[in-house]
Amino acid sequence: MKLRNISEQVMVITGATSGIGLTTARMAADEGAQLLLIARNEEALRRLTDEINQSGGRAVYHACDVADEGSLRQAGEKAISEFGRIDTWVNNAGGSIYGRIMDVPVDDLRRVFETNVWGVIYGSRIAVEHLRDRGGAIINIGSEVSDAPVPLQGIYSASKHAVKGFTDALRIEVEADGLPISITLIKPTAIHTPFPENAKNYLPYEPQLPGPLYAPDLVAEAIIHCAQHPVRDFFIGEMAKLHSSLAMNAPRLYDTVQEKTIDSMQNSGEPSVINRHDGLYSPNSRLQERGSAERFVLEDSLYQRAKIHPLITAGLLAGSGIAIAAIVGSRMKRTSSGTDNRDEMRTGRAAELNDRHARSGEISAAEAAEPTRAMSATNFDGGGI
């Protein structure tokens, strides 16, 4: 399956005004993609679209809630009317709730599923309708919690499990029908976005994402890569792969670790803000890629480098291994040579000294005939090197 170069693509991005979606929109625009941007806040969309167009890019927007299938369908039609086609559809919009499952009202639980799951289902179905003849890519944003659930974000974990199941099933059906559509599930680890700030909170403290955090640029880079190269799934960050493997291969151990750290890992240390604004029902107008809290952020990932550039990474690792082997071998050779030279010098000095002592009568002639044994005894008695 051949996908267009990003500079020739028309890309639809949901959740385009915050976090991963915003970073992806800006990066894709810089790469030359034409964009149809979707989010709920029209003011933020207008500002972002103006920013991209004034910088030499090409973007239009459609304000809608992805849980509204009819409005989302209109977004797809707008992309066709503006650009003539769609090449990649990125289902990124999502939200979360912090709180124990039994403490969260059912209406809020349902709202997360409407956005995170039904938004992906609607978007994917619309995308298949547009892509089934000319081909293209559907990229759904899952999470490491698609494989490894996290307490206090139970409904978010459940929604991302649903996204994974839906995406995998849709991929199988599309491939069985022979449709030229690549379907990718992106599974990021903790990313430094306003995610905790925009989540509704039922905890007594302000939540945080457990570290280490990765830069949203890594997710955007992966999305753009998958828009050009068919990829089944893509973990973002080494920790995502680790958590997924642990949860699947040692589930009881994973559960125990989560039980022991249920509060500490997600507690920012700050008391909960009363009447804080969250994005569950109403969005804000900020264009914010990264979280407000000062956190250590990993700007790169060796795992991702290897995933995107496997041959280059293999070559670099092989080259590094050869270089290390050469350095170690050279040092061992120098050490061996140096030891031989020192032994020869010691033996020579010992023979000269013993000969001198023998002539002066200090030691016997028999002792003088064995300088090497005398020197060896000195080494093993602790008086040598």
Label for each model-derived stretch:
Residues 10, 17-19:
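Conserved glycine-rich cofactor-binding loop
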Residues 124, 159:
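Active-site helix of classical SDR
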Residues 31-48:
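Conserved glycine-rich Rossmann-like NAD(P)H-binding loop of the short-chain dehydrogenase/reductase
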Residues 307-333:
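Hydrophobic alpha-helical topogenic segments used for membrane insertion/localization
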Residues 176-269:
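SDR active-site lid
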Residues 100-101, 108-110, 316:
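Substrate-binding pocket helix/loop in short-chain dehydrogenase/reductase
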Residues 42-43, 63-74, 106:
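The beta1-alpha1 cofactor-binding region of Rossmann-like NAD(H)/NADP(H)-dependent oxidoreductases
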